[in-house]
Amino acid sequence: MSKLRWLIMAFLVCLLLLTPKDLEGLQLVGAIRNHLFWSTSSPLHHLPDLLEEESVQVNEMELWGDDDGRRRMMGEEVRRQAGAGRMSEVKMGGDRPLVAVIKKEKHGAKKKKDDDSSGMVVVGLSAACVALVTLVGICFCACRDSESSSSPYDLRDEKPLLSLNLSDGPSRKSCATTIDVSRLGALTAECEQHLHGGAGAGDHNTTNYNLRKPAGVGSMSMNKVSMQSQAMRMSSHEITTIAGAGRVENKVSTIAPSAAAAAVASAGGGQVPAAPPPPAGPPPPAPPPLPPSHHHHHGHHPPPPHPLPPGAGAGAGTGAPPPPPAHPAAPAPPPPAPSPSAAGAGSGPPPPPPPAAPAAPRPPGPGPGPPPPPGAAGRGGGGPPPPALPGGPRARGPPPFKKSPGAAAAAAQADPNKAKLKPFFWDKVTANPNQAMVWDQIKAGSFQFNEEMIESLFGAQSTEKKSTDAKKESGKEATQFVRILDPKKAQNLAISLKALSVSAEQVRAAVMEGHDLPPDLIQTLVRWSPTSDEELRLRLYAGEPAQLGPAEQFMRAIIDVPYLYQRLDALLFMAALPEEAAAVEQSFATLEVACEELRGSRLFKKLLEAVLKTGNRMNDGTFRGGAQAFKLDTLLKLADVKGVDGKTTLLHFVVQEIIRSEGVRAARAASGGGGGSSISSISSSDDLILLQSQSSIGSNSGRSSVDASSLEQEQDETERYRQLGLGVVSSLGDDLQNVRKAASFDADALTITVASLGHRLVKANEFLSTGMRSLEEDSGFQRRLASFVQQSQEQVTRLLEDEKRLRSLVRATVDYFHGSTGKDEGLRLFVVVRDFLGILDKVCREVKEQAAANAKAKKQQQPTPAPRSRQSSQSSFRDPRQQIQDRRAAALSRNNSSSSSSDSDD
């Protein structure tokens, strides 16, 4: 909305709010004000009939003319109306008439009381005050925006500007002020004629403008609007108006300094002819300022110069800088150089021709002044030196650094013909001439190395050349190949084919005739098989085969074989079946033997008996005692139960007992006695020796029954029995060797392998009966496949039956030791036995080492018991039976000594 409309609306609202309702001539305004914003307790004095009409009518009245006519017509119209209504809207603007709309509505409500009317009056006054303050603020903001928008710094236009220098003004300063004509409204033809016609008059102090209001405001006439204040503000300044592309519409004439009131005139405009562009060169310097007396002397104004080049106006004055251009413009062509005669003349140089395209001004900012023209040396002082041209010679930089004498000497000594070797990274030390060093004693010719040898061993040039050549060749090969397969797939396939050294013709012949192929090659071809899309692209490829990569060439040569990958699967099955079937059969045989060994081992049963009796003895009197069997997992817990000495475990005790019993049994079996009699123990023989010694001690007549030599013989015999028993117990691991092998098998893996063989055989049979029969070919592959299927059916069927039988056998073996638990534990029984055999072997080694230590200590023992006790304390394990034998030997020696003493007394 225009600022004038804001002012008119504010004036009308203030008139409605502030006009007294009893003022003569403005009674209608007061009445409208009272009925619009607040109601009174009594009817209006001047409009008594407005509040008693019940029917609703709407009448619009237009009041024309001046104020008297408006009041007269409004008064007559109100008195003439039949009813009364409420004035709802009043509008006024410029030349548009004031429109008053009187609405009549039904009057069915009763009259309000005086107390309600007073409350409404207070509310209405408050609302009116708030509205008045709001309107005043809006008007203030609108006026402020109007002033800020009229500032010369905010009026921006991207069009070129035309500058006029005011040479005859009192000041040399210039101010670039842009005037936007659209902000003031369109100029009428009258104003344009007045502006153009007033150029020659020169005696007008004021200029009248007839502004045409825009369509939205109404028909307004603004006659006799004085621009004297604006002209006074713009006096002695340079005024820049907006011009079109190569055409000037309006110009502002210069202002006379002697006039009392500055007048605004315009100079005649016209078409500016475009001069041909001069040759390219550096941007021209700014023209020099003219002396103040130049125009007064000659009596005419100088012609306007062309627009200054970019940057020329920066130092011309202190006025507002022009806005930056929207797009960068080319610099203006240079003016022709003035002649020497013109340089010394009093008049300024002729203006240069204007450029073909107006040059845009530079963005605001200080900059160095341009250099003076060639002819301005005699008229004024010189300016700063011109800046360096973009294409001119650059300034010389600092001189390059000089090399150190050592580096220069090393570079001079370097022979370009020598081969380049690998670098040897070391720390160089600079020799100090003032200090004696070891390096001073090294002579130059004391050592000579073989140059050829060092070049052959540590040469770097040949390897780099080879690597670069290889990279170039590989790059050339990679660029000329057509890739169809996936890059990773093609790379892996090419590597496998190169490693196996197999051609596509060999693979094609093997697939068609049924020849043997390496299983690795078949697995590679099946694994990196192309997708359906890649296979279709290989079949439809019509280019040169040499343009394909190695993998693509190989696959394209064999891809047209019917049922290629079904044939490869059949060949792989035919190659893998014998080996896989043999491995499965070997595993089944091992499992069967392991079950038989575990169930028929006498020594293993003896071990279980010893553990059962020992456990019942230790658990006697508790709920754990009286057991008749135990799970084989208990064997792994024997090594965890230790004796009071902290060294002997329960497993050690059980092994010692089994060694003793098995030693006597082995000795009697070797001597041929004890066929059906019960095996006597070592302890019974020891007791017999002890009884014999006691009887010899008690009877004086039989003092010579047992001597020391016989006791030593018995001890040696006992040690021999122990060694025999230790060998029998240690051989348990060898007797259950197949059990250890069976523990490494996986029952589920064996079952899956056998099932896979059967499934692949069924698949090969289906391919033979459907796919190959549809081809109706009599090839070597078909004949071999038929023979293979017929022979393999019996073998695979037998493997399936063996798998079922061995599963039942393993289940029966587990039940034989653990009972019918109803849980399928697989081959876990063999795993437990294997782990126990490992612990048993460790204990047998410890017992053997202890026996060797005891034999060595027996040889080195002294007559006194102290060394024996000390030796026994040093041992890691002490056999209780050895202690019994030592006590018996001591008793026999005491008996012999007492017998000899009694004989001497006699």
Swiss-Prot record:
InterPro entries: FH2_Formin (IPR015425), FH2_Formin_sf (IPR042201), Formin-like_plant (IPR027643). Residues 411-866 form the FH2 domain. It is a single-pass membrane protein. GO terms for cellular component: cytoskeleton; membrane. GO terms for molecular function: actin filament binding. It is found in: Membrane. It comes from the Eukaryota. One of its GO terms (biological process) is actin cytoskeleton organization. Belongs to the formin-like family. Class-I subfamily. This is Formin-like protein 18. The gene is FH18.
